[in-house]
């Protein structure tokens, strides 16, 4: 038996030996992984340089404002187009050209105007009359009436026809409506194209569809933004409620851990049960209603999610999903009921540790602020990089011409050879790009920007884990609690992490960042290859995505435990990761049962908080609470604030529970070390609490017993 035990330990490393000088986290330690610290500092300097370059060349106005054929912004304050907020297309029918899908521009002149045309008028009719004063505001800036009509229309100085239009996303689109099933614009069922020909309204519809297709995503974003502007304070109230519930839950957990865990389990089951009941009631209510039996497949994707709530199949799907979750949770609770008692003991011990280090509950705010700083820098740099291209002008024409698609200069295009080669062609703004070294490097800079975001974000999370681990390890290794607990354990752990272990944190976060950026690239390639019919390529891509997902999960698990060892012993990252991994492998059964059951209980706590706040938000924003029915704001998509509240509530609950989770993981690792280092004798007493000793049938022997 002893030989087997020796072989087992040899296979998974050597257990920690008794050290009479060890009293918890080592204070006299040296710097670790200095090379990685230097690399991180150099990378940050380079990241700042990239940000400065991007801010120098970038122009976010290119995202906000529409751009005319000369590359000038419509509605931008401080410019000559400050009062011209709308983009007007000379001939929107040409937007039906396939060129729109290739160049993302309609092959027709576009100008900025103060307001969209509100009457039907042709250039031939307006020319030489008083109505031309109204008409010429839709001609190119600086137009002078010294050309023949044919020259004006050929050169694209004025549109051939004005059609009643309405603004949509700062663009002028024909005001098309249906009257008794017939499409009309104004009071007409057809229109004159300005060249003496009558055309059908459907031509306008096709042109408007193609032009509008480019803007649908932006229009959806604008409607979502409108919902945020009228509901942001209610969203904040919902997040505050989630914060209060999380804090209240953790305070109660400190004093009533056992009762709270069982109450939490029962409440989650009841919440899911109510969800099943509500889905069944909605399913029954829709029986017999017109259109409620349409299948989800036949309906297809709809941006207005309220449409799905009028289908019986939707509520049936919800009911099945919730029922499956209910059965899974009940079965897990039945088979893990004995292990739950052990997990409760760990949570109680963690509650005591958090009680002695109460400032640890505020540390997630520090992590949150640092992450917000990383996100803000990454997002602003990405926007400035994406808008740092120069305006590129190309030749557009609705005729077949060799020069179409070539770059041009709008200043001298009328005197160029391409203009004479392609009569009726226009040199207009196409997109933002460039051929300089900087512009060719933009994709690489965007990848570097994303990589640095992952690295710094993971570094911030690692700093928080090491800080909390150091504080809670100080609690565990205090033989007489709380008398032997050092003053300000959280601040001491934070200082040690930054002073000695910045390099180790940079090393661990670098490994994770590399895997994450590879996963992002794989997702990008997967989107690009979706149209391909190569089954082997799809299979290979799926395998790669799965492998790197598993690798990321493993590295996160290994890093977390390595950071605990760094906080305790002050060793470098590789040594800490190896020791933590072998320690866990020597106690793999305890890891699988105790640690993961505790994680499961914390997940149930998050679901309870998120579910409660989510249900409250659903009833509020759908005007189903009669007391505050008139208080809820009118919305385009009520799911926007509901999803925001749900995601925000989860992040808040996760922030609070992450402290508890780190505490449990730290105490668990310290507990395993305690079992290997000590034997309960006077010389080598156990540091674990009396509760854990009773739970594991361990005791510290008294002098007479020794």
UniProtKB/Swiss-Prot annotation:
The protein's superkingdom reads Eukaryota
- GO MF, any single term: transmembrane transporter activity
- Indicate what this protein is called per its UniProt record: Choline transporter-like protein 2
Summarize the PTM comment.
Answer: N-glycosylated.
Listed InterPro entries: Choline_transptr-like (IPR007603)
GO cellular component terms given for this protein? membrane; mitochondrial outer membrane; plasma membrane
Q: How does it assemble?
A: Interacts with COCH.
Family of the protein in this entry: Belongs to the CTL (choline transporter-like) family.
Instruction: Write down a Pfam family by its short name.
Output: Choline_transpo
UniProt-annotated location(s): Cell membrane; Mitochondrion outer membrane
Chain's gene name: SLC44A2
Segments in the Cytoplasmic topological domain:
1-33, 254-256, 337-364, 462-504, 585-599, 660-706
Which biological process annotations from GO are given for this protein?
Answer: choline transport; ethanolamine transport; transmembrane transport
UniProt topology in membrane: Multi-pass membrane protein
User: Catalysed reaction(s)?
Assistant: choline(out) + n H(+)(in) = choline(in) + n H(+)(out); ethanolamine(out) + n H(+)(in) = ethanolamine(in) + n H(+)(out)
Membrane spanning stretches: 34-54, 233-253, 257-277, 316-336, 365-385, 441-461, 505-525, 564-584, 600-620, 639-659
Keyword annotations from UniProtKB, A to Z: Antiport, Cell membrane, Glycoprotein, Membrane, Mitochondrion, Mitochondrion outer membrane, Phosphoprotein, Transmembrane, Transmembrane helix, Transport
Q: Which residues form the signal peptide?
A: none
Residues recorded as bearing Phosphothreonine in the entry: 14
Sites where a glycan is attached: 187, 200
Please list the residue ranges that the record places on the Extracellular side of the membrane. Answer: 55-232, 278-315, 386-440, 526-563, 621-638
């Amino acid at each position: 038996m002893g030989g087997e035990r020796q072989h087992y330990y040899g296979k998974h490393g050597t257990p920690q030996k008794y050290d009479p000088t060890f009293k918890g986290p080592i204070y006299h330690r040296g710097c670790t992984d200095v090379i990685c610290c230097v690399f991180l500092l150099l990378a940050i300097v380079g990241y700042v340089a990239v940000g400065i370059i991007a801010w120098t060349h970038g122009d976010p106005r290119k995202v906000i404002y529409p751009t005319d054929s000369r590359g000038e912004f419509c509605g931008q304050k401080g410019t000559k187009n400050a009062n011209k907020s709308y983009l007007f297309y000379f001939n929107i029918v040409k937007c039906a050209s396939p060129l729109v899908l290739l160049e993302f521009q309609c092959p027709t002149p576009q100008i900025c105007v103060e307001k969209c045309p509100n009457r039907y008028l042709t250039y031939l009719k307006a020319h030489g009359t008083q109505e031309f004063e109204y008409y010429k505001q839709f001609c190119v800036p600086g137009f002078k009436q010294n050309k023949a009509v044919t020259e004006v229309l050929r050169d694209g100085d004025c549109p051939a026809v004005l059609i009643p239009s309405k603004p949509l996303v700062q663009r002028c689109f024909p005001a098309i409506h249906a009257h008794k099933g017939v499409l009309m614009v104004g009071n007409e069922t057809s229109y004159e194209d300005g060249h003496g020909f009558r055309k059908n309204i459907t031509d306008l519809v096709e042109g408007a569809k193609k032009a509008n297709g480019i803007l649908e995503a932006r229009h959806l974003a604008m409607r979502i933004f409108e919902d945020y502007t009228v509901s942001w304070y209610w969203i904040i109230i919902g997040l505050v409620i989630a914060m209060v519930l999380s804090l209240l839950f953790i305070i109660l957990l400190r004093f009533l851990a056992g009762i709270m865990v069982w109450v939490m389990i029962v409440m989650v089951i009841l919440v899911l049960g109510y969800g099943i009941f509500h889905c069944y009631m909605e399913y029954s209510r829709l029986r017999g209603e017109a259109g409620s039996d349409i299948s989800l497949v036949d309906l297809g994707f709809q941006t207005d999610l309220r449409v799905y709530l009028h289908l019986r199949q939707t509520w049936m799907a919800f009911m099945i999903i919730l029922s499956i979750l209910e059965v899974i949770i009940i079965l897990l609770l039945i088979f893990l009921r004995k292990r739950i008692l052990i997990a409760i003991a760990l949570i109680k011990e963690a509650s005591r540790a958090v009680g002695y280090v109460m400032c640890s509950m505020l540390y997630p705010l520090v992590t949150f602020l640092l992450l917000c700083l990383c996100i803000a820098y990454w997002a602003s740099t990405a926007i400035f990089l994406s808008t740092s291209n120069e305006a590129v002008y190309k030749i557009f024409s609705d005729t077949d011409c060799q020069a179409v698609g070539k770059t041009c200069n709008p200043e001298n295009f009328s005197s160029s050879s391409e203009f004479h080669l392609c009569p009726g062609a226009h040199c207009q703004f196409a997109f933002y790009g460039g051929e300089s070294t900087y512009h060719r490097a933009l994709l690489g800079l965007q990848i570097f920007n994303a990589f640095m975001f992952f690295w710094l974000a993971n570094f911030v999370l690692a700093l928080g884990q090491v800080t909390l681990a150091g504080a809670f390890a100080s609690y565990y290794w205090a033989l007489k609690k709380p008398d032997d607990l050092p003053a300000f354990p959280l601040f001491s752990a934070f200082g040690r992490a930054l002073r000695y272990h910045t390099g180790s944190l940079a090393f661990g976060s670098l490994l994770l960042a590399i895997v994450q950026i590879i996963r992002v690239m794989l997702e990008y390639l997967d989107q690009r290859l979706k149209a391909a019919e190569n089954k082997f390529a799809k299979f290979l891509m799926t395998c790669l995505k799965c492998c790197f997902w598993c690798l990321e999960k493993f590295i996160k698990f290994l890093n977390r435990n390595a950071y605990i060892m760094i906080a305790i012993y002050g060793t470098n990252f590789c040594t800490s990761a190896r020791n933590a991994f072998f320690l866990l492998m020597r106690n793999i059964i305890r890891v699988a049962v105790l640690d993961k059951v505790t994680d499961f209980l914390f997940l149930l706590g998050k679901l309870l908080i998120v579910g409660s706040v989510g249900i409250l938000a659903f009833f509020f924003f759908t005007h189903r609470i009669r007391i505050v029915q008139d208080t809820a704001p009118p919305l385009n998509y009520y799911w926007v604030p509901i999803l925001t509240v749900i995601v925000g509530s989860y992040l808040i609950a996760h922030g609070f529970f992450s402290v508890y989770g780190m505490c449990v993981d730290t105490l668990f690792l310290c507990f395993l070390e305690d079992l290997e280092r000590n034997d309960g004798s006077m010389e080598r007493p156990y540091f674990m609490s009396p509760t854990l000793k009773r739970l594991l049938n361990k005791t510290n022997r008294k002098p007479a017993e020794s």
